[in-house]
Design a protein with these regions (language model features):
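Short pre-active-site segment immediately N-terminal to redox-active cysteine/selenocysteine motifs
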Residues: 65-66, 72-76, 119
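N-terminal targeting signals for export/organelle localization
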Residues: 2-47
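Structural micro-motif
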Residues: 109, 115-124
Length: 146
């Protein structure tokens, strides 16, 4: 009887671990397989791909070749977590047309400070030419598309 109970428990545990690991793997494949362009940036990458504020502190000069959205977020932030799937949908819809970048404010404190990020999520909307605009708080897919 103990052997049967132990076997059932072991199989249940194995099934649970396998199911959880399988979900994580398919999520990563989904992000790569659908050409989603959500890129997590460090300060060095931001300076190269978006705006080198150290070299040009007074003049905005976008370094990219197409418009971009920069999401300043934190992993513990509820509204940031709610915004993540919305940005993934935008990345699918506008793949190849818009860069979508994410910056973890806890890992990149200096970068967040340089932009005066006080509330998260904060979205920095960067047009191909002209000055960027800012949106704060979680917003819906419909609002982001407008």
């Amino acid at each position: 009887m103990k052997l049967i109970k132990s076997t059932i428990t072991a199989l249940g545990l194995l099934f649970t671990v396998t199911a959880c690991a399988g979900n994580k793997e398919s999520k990563n494949q989904n992000m790569k397989g659908e050409n989603m362009e959500i890129v997590h940036l460090t300060k060095a990458e931001f300076l190269k791909k978006v705006y080198n504020y150290e070299a040009n502190p007074n003049d905005w000069k976008y370094e990219g070749d197409k418009p971009a959205i920069v999401d300043f977020y934190a992993t513990w932030c509820g509204p940031c977590k709610a915004l993540a799937p919305v940005l993934e949908e935008l990345a699918k819809e506008y793949a190849g047309k818009v860069y979508i970048y994410k910056i973890d404010v806890d890992k990149e404190e200096e970068l967040a400070g340089a932009f005066g990020i006080r509330s998260i999520p904060t979205l920095l909307w960067i047009p191909q030419s002209g000055k960027p605009t800012v949106t704060q708080g979680a917003v819906s897919y419909t609002h982001l598309r407008a």
